[in-house]
Amino acid sequence: MEFKTYSDFFDKNANSIINWFEGELAKVRSGRANLKILDNVRAEYYGEQTPLIEMASLSIPEPREILIKPYEKSSVNLIQAALLKANLNLTPVVDGDKIRIKLPLLTEENRKENVKKVKAVGEKAKQEVRFIRRDTLNKIKSDKIADKDLNKYFEEQVDKITKKYIDQIDSILAKKEKDLLSL
């Protein structure tokens, strides 16, 4: 029996958790413009709820500004309405055929609240990694490895991999916290 089967299972699942975690952190405002905060915004477009990325080009001309240039001028007001409806605490300003969003400076209170949010998301990600650890250990047990030493070795390796992913989450979290707390 090879450990690679178990490590591949663990890595595949843990990497998807890391990707989810990074995506969630990108949505939390840090005072700098980030297009990820618009990922869930959808506007009515030809009768369908359409993601902004499919209706307009999105860019960051300045560190605290997002520029939205709709592909069709007629959709400017639809996009503005969708941004207001999305409840992101942003003020979209129509500037001719484009929309500008100036990101306000975050207050100390907002920053601390955002740190709490990212810590909660970090805990959720760690919990998911621990669930993967449990599932991997259950797979090892269900395969009924006769050699007790090999079984123990596999469990130790799973613990090492778990620690690696938990440390990776902690590192990403620390970087985001630093970003949130810096002015």
UniProtKB/Swiss-Prot annotation:
PANTHER family: MITOCHONDRIAL RIBOSOME RECYCLING FACTOR PSEUDO 1, RIBOSOME RECYCLING FACTOR. Keywords: Cytoplasm, Protein biosynthesis. GO terms for molecular function: ribosomal large subunit binding. Coiled coil: none annotated. It comes from Mycoplasmoides gallisepticum (strain R(low / passage 15 / clone 2)) (Mycoplasma gallisepticum). Its main location: cytoplasm. GO terms for biological process: translational termination. Responsible for the release of ribosomes from messenger RNA at the termination of protein biosynthesis. May increase the efficiency of translation by recycling ribosomes from one round of translation to another. Belongs to the RRF family. It is found in: Cytoplasm. This is Ribosome-recycling factor. Gene3D superfamilies: 3.30.1360.40, Ribosome-recycling factor. GO terms for cellular component: cytoplasm. Pfam families: RRF (PF01765).
